[in-house]
């Protein structure tokens, strides 16, 4: 009886949350959205699904370490969050008392970073006496596909569709049945694709974040210059740790023969490793379309900005 009662309570809470979210969107109310899951402090104001402002404060402090330092990230969030939110409201040309709700990232992400965004959102919502909407970070990547820039009309995916959510922390193939009905049908069992890009860039001595730099250099290189061993998992799951290790050992052996090997072959190395990562992503995604029968596919997350991945998506229709 207790289990049944608890299940009913959870169902009622979910129903109320879904109803609140849809009501706010349909009524074109103003929503403040706050994101602090990693090293960027972000705030946006939306009217329904229209983005009125989107302010991002980057944390340059991590560049010297070649990766995100959690303690430094949380401190920077504390410094940035008030100015960022203030700027978001000003750019949207609204006052705080016009907000109908505050949405914030509840996870996954760095604990200290999440706490800053969560604490600020709760305190701000309490002071304004408006509802809070918790957002899963990965789901947020997907829901961003439905957002529209003011004055623009973008193509919106129709349900059901497959989404390749690929970032520094996640690599997942998600079957999106509805706004609140998402099934993960494939995921990485170790490193995320974005993490692999950044770690490989670090091995090459490139600055952080390395993914965009690899993408830029890859445009000047030969993607077939070098090949690397990669995992061939059954099903729809990914693995990138083996590819990273193969790249590391490949460079180690080449550098013994020529200490300037990386500098001489930088563009080809970037093009080749990017091709391997993208081929791995696309192979599983194409397999997912065949297994599910769903042809409509979208990409979301930070790595979706990669030009090579975008080209591969277009080539596969």
Model-based region annotation:
Residues 29-108, 137, 141:
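N-terminal beta-alpha supersecondary unit
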